[in-house]
Design a protein with these regions (language model features):
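Short cysteine/histidine-rich zinc-coordinating motifs and their immediately flanking basic loops
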Residues: 1-7, 16-23, 71-79, 107-114
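Short Fe-S-cluster ligation motifs
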Residues: 31-38, 89-100, 121-143
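Short metal-coordination and nucleic-acid-contact micro-motifs, chiefly zinc-binding Cys/His arrays
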Residues: 1-5, 53-58, 88-92
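Short Cys/His-rich Zn2+-coordinating modules
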Residues: 40-49, 76-82
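Short cysteine-rich loop/turn motifs with clustered Cys
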Residues: 44-72, 96
Length: 161
């Protein structure tokens, strides 16, 4: 199958193809230089967006507020305490930003009470238990980002399964 109409078009097509390949190669090289933290932040951003959308019609997990100006995706077990639970949906819930998540450092006593109601004793006990540390990689972070992008799209379309 012929892609171009003649020699002049072939030269132009060849140059454009080479430019596209060069741009793609540069992008691959730039991406390889980005640190792991770049990919983790991107994954966490979309994960948190998903959690806020998932819990949009629910009150703050800690204080029950429904009218906060800003909402966070608050972690019951902090990322600093256990990075393995950073993207675990049982560990992340909608939380009012200024009062509970910032001023009260997560309002953990009331967060735990809210979790007990929401996920039950068995899952809460699992969450509070020991978890094998996992090494985060760029590939895993990119996979997490893709996973939550897809879940967010499905949620917005109304596909909750």
């Amino acid at each position: 199958m012929q892609v171009v109409c003649g020699l002049d078009c072939a030269l132009i097509y060849s140059k454009e193809t080479a430019k596209k390949k060069e741009k793609k190669d540069i992008k691959i090289k730039k991406d390889a230089l980005k640190p792991l933290s770049y990919y983790v932040k991107k994954a966490e951003k979309i994960c948190n967006e998903y959690i806020r959308a998932r819990d949009a019609n629910l009150p703050c997990i800690s204080c029950g507020a429904i009218d906060a100006k800003k909402w966070d995706a608050g972690h019951y077990i902090s990322v600093g305490a256990n990075r393995t639970l950073r993207f675990n949906e049982l560990n992340i819930h909608k939380q009012c930003s200024f009062n509970c998540n910032v001023n009260l450092s997560g309002n953990l006593i009331n967060y735990r009470k809210g979790l007990l109601k929401k996920i039950g004793q068995e899952k809460l006990a699992w969450l509070e238990g020991w978890h094998e540390p996992e090494k985060m990689t760029k590939e895993k972070a990119m996979s997490v980002e893709k996973y939550y992008k897809e879940k967010l799209i499905d949620l917005k379309k109304g596909n909750h399964g």
